[in-house]
């Protein structure tokens, strides 16, 4: 059975049958077991725990999102950890663990009474979207489409004839007279960049190495982690000097942000972690970057990284990401799956036509395609930190080293360069305006309109420069707010999909506040699908303003998931929010004859037995409808006198239309038992019980 994880505080809605049965709610057992608590106000979800799938996260640290920084100190003490990174811009800290696994840290944290903590999550594993090093095939471009030929590749550089990608996207020397990305800062969030390469001299400004909190001086070799970032940087902004190659935006400046560092220093594959990626993105944003290139990704949904991306876009930064090299349809990879980004597929040109590259990931989030096959660009020199080899047959006279790579990692920087050029012409453009301009002016070479392979088609800089900047057709942020039926608490970890008629889609998950944020998306008509919560996420249930000590909010029933759909919802500057109220139904019926017991009653309690929400006389085959309650409840049977023998009490819970057998054992000498589908399972201890609960949203 799938585990569905959900938490909420109880809304004190007492059914009519309870209110007339025992208005004082006096307990039948000791006060410490069933203390009277007639009302609990809804507090919402207090701590959200990121998913832990084997092999998809790294050990050694946890990331904590907070509202109250002082509460973080309790976590640090409990896990015997050390704060190694502070991100006040998004209210996140990174805590290094000392000999403790992430799962063990979760267990320690769930035992605390905390206020003001939003989430705890691991750092997920990410990979560079590794390119293939290729030897150029001289016959590859012999059969040419009219207008795509070597004589048109005159960029005044000695290797102009190799730059088929620039020609394909409409770059000309005349175009650069209008705009070349002059003074636009481009953050290459990647391995480091060799700023001493002859084609990058003067192009690389100060950057940042977040894992070591080190500012990288302008013009230096920072190619920690390998050659990937240098190749990306050359495609974007290699200088125009008559030698070597030239980038799409030779007037732009490169800001290296090293997130794939030296594996010998940071471990693993060199990935510094979601926390340091967030630090790098924030640093780049705060230091003037206007567009960022991300040619990397992975599977885990990181709230920290999502907030960093949102932070950048809120400050007007355009985020360009590679679609990936997985060939098949790929969904829920990040950062490509975050809303508001420009996701780029890789294209090839062969036999007189363009086509999607065989390795390029297909996705319902692809925006545009760009050249990604046999791309010549800069690589670190032989004496450089990140030297990984070069193509010795490239006839450059400037002493620089070059190589041919292919992958969506090579496609994305073509688009990033295009964005830099456009931002020179449209310096106040919002991220959604730039993306929409690219999509509106793309070359739909296969005539399909938008598709999973190439998005809206091949990006065309010449057309985009001539096209007007859209003033309509986008919103700066759209929100989907998911709450219980009464709107008392937000529901986190709910997946929200926004699908358009053409099949393209945006995805996001609700955060601890129950809000899914979609920054800088297109306006228009969407079919919106809401479902969850995500069964891989965990949370702590709130209680009277604090998290329940030990309350790992595990609801073990698929039937507790809720879904909602909104067909034809119009998103516009005047309609930037959708409110979704989940609702539930829950009825209980017992089949066991309890006539031998003294005054048995059906009792609804909170999972810690701190409060009695209602009671009524027990009756066999009577339906008890709890559908007006919202939050987490447990229930059981209580008698006036102890049972003489063990009695197994059986029944059925009908939860959202699904029948679930339940039972509990009233042991000899006791007066009560919890009833559930696990036989009254106590996740806590006798002195601090935590019973399996039922999560419902009310009506």
Curated annotation (Swiss-Prot):
Coiled coil: none annotated. It holds the Pfam family Ig_DR_A0283-like. Ca(2+) binds at residues 157, 199, 239, 241, 243, 245. The keyword Metal-binding applies. GO terms for molecular function: calcium ion binding; peptidase activity; serine-type endopeptidase activity. It is found in: Cell surface. One of its GO terms (cellular component) is cell surface. Protease able to degrade keratin into peptides. Is responsible for keratinolysis by F.pennivorans, which allows this bacterium to grow on native feathers. This is Fervidolysin. It comes from Fervidobacterium pennivorans.
């Amino acid at each position: 059975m799938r585990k569905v994880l959900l938490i909420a505080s109880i809304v004190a809605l007492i059914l009519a049958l309870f209110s007339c049965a025992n208005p004082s709610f006096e307990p039948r057992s000791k006060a410490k077991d069933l203390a009277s608590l007639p009302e609990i106000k809804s507090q919402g979800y207090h701590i959200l725990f990121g998913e832990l799938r084997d092999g998809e996260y790294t050990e050694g640290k946890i990331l904590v999102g907070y509202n109250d920084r002082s509460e973080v100190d309790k976590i640090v003490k409990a896990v015997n950890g050390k704060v190694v990174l502070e991100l006040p811009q998004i209210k996140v800290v990174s805590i290094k663990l000392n000999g403790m696994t992430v799962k063990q840290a979760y267990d320690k944290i769930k035992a605390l009474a905390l206020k003001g903590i939003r989430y705890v999550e691991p750092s997920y594993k990410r990979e560079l979207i590794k390119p293939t090093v290729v030897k150029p095939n001289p016959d590859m471009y012999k059969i040419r489409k009219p207008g795509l030929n070597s004589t048109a590749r005159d960029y005044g550089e000695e290797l102009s004839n190799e730059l088929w990608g620039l020609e394909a996207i409409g770059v000309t020397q005349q175009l650069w007279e209008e705009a070349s990305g002059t003074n636009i800062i481009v953050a290459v969030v990647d391995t480091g960049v060799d700023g001493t390469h002859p084609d990058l001299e003067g192009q690389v400004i100060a950057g940042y190495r977040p894992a070591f909190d080190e500012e990288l001086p302008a013009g230096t070799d920072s190619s920690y982690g390998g050659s990937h970032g240098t190749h990306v940087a050359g495609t974007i902004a290699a200088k125009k000097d008559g030698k070597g190659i030239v980038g799409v935006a030779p007037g732009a400046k490169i800001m290296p942000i090293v997130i794939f560092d030296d594996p010998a220093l940071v471990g693993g594959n060199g990935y510094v972690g979601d926390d340091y990626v967030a630090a790098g993105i924030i640093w780049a944003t705060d230091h003037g970057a206007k567009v960022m290139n991300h040619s990397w990704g992975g599977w885990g949904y990181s709230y920290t990284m999502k907030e960093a991306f949102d932070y950048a876009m809120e400050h007007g930064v355009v985020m360009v990401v590679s679609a990936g090299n997985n060939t098949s349809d790929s969904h829920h990879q990040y950062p490509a799956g975050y809303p508001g980004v420009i996701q780029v597929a890789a294209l090839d040109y062969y036999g007189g036509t363009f086509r999607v590259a065989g390795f390029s990931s297909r996705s319902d989030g692809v925006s545009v395609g760009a050249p990604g096959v046999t791309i010549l660009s800069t690589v670190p020199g032989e004496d450089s930190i990140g030297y990984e080899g070069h193509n010795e047959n490239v006839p450059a006279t400037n002493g620089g080293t070059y190589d041919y790579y292919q992958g969506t990692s090579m496609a994305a920087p073509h688009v990033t360069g295009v964005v830099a050029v456009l931002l020179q012409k449209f310096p106040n453009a919002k991220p959604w305006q730039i993306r929409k301009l690219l999509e509106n002016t793309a070359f739909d070479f296969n005539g399909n309109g938008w598709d999973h392979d190439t998005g809206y088609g091949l990006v065309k800089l010449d057309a985009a420069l001539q096209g007007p900047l859209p003033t309509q057709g986008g919103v700066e942020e759209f929100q989907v707010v998911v709450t219980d039926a009464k709107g008392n608490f937000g529901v986190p970890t709910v997946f929200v999909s926004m699908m358009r008629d053409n099949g393209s889609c945006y995805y996001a998950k609700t955060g601890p506040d129950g809000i899914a944020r979609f920054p800088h998306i297109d306006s228009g008509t969407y079919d919106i699908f809401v479902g969850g919560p995500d069964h891989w996420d965990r949370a702590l249930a709130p209680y009277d303003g604090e998290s329940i000590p030990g309350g790992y909010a595990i609801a073990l029933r698929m039937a507790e998931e809720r879904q909602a759909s909104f067909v034809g919802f119009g998103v516009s500057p005047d309609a930037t929010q959708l409110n979704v109220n989940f609702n539930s139904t829950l009825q209980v019926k017992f089949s066991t004859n309890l006539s031998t017991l003294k005054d048995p009653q059906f009792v609804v309690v909170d999972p810690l037995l701190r409060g009695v929400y209602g009671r009524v006389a027990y009756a066999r085959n009577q339906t008890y409808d709890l559908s007006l309650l919202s939050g987490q409840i447990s229930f059981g049977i209580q008698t006036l006198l102890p049972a003489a023998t063990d009695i197994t009490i059986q029944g059925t819970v009908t939860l959202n239309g699904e029948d679930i057998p339940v039972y509990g054992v009233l042991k000899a000498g006791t007066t009560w038992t919890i009833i559930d589908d696990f036989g009254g399972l106590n996740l806590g201890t006798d002195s601090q019980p935590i019973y399996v609960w039922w999560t419902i949203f009310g009506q």
